[in-house]
């Protein structure tokens, strides 16, 4: 399944994104190229939990500021207007490549309540 972001425009953002786990010294970095968003932890589970929190804060802040659409479009996402707004990820060639070796990749799907 490919990356997507959907929002009802009022209270919920649903995100499904690919996240890379990268060993960097004593830490594991969780990095999402499609959002240029990262977090880290002492182990994989800690890095995944940190990424979930970062993703939640990211969408909550964008929603509060009313800049979700603008930021996603600037990151290369495409907007489709359906009954709810749906964003398609940028093409692979536009994604930033992380300079470190990717150890593992996982998909993160979250339903994020936004205020």
Per-range role (PLM):
Residues 1-16, 49-115:
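Short, charged, surface-exposed hinge/linker loops at domain edges
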Residues 15-34:
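Short aromatic-glycine-(Arg/Gly/Cys) micro-motifs in beta-strand/loop hairpins
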Residues 29-31, 46, 53:
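Residues within well-formed alpha-helices
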Residues 29-31, 40, 63:
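Short acidic, gly/pro-rich beta-turn/loop elements at beta-sheet edges
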Residues 34-46:
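A short, exposed loop/beta-hairpin motif centered on an aromatic-Gly-Thr core
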């Amino acid at each position: 399944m490919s990356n997507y972001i959907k929002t009802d425009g009022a209270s919920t953002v649903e995100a499904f994104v690919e996240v890379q786990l990268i060993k960097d010294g004593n830490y594991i970095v969780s990095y999402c190229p499609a959002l240029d968003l990262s977090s880290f932890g002492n182990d994989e589970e800690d890095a995944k939990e940190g990424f979930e929190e970062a993703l939640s804060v990211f969408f909550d802040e964008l929603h509060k500021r009313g800049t979700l659409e603008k930021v996603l479009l600037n990151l290369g996402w495409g907007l489709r207007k359906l009954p709810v707004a749906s964003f398609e990820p940028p093409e692979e060639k536009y994604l930033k490549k992380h300079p470190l070796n990717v150890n593992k990749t996982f998909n993160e799907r979250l339903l994020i309540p936004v205020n």
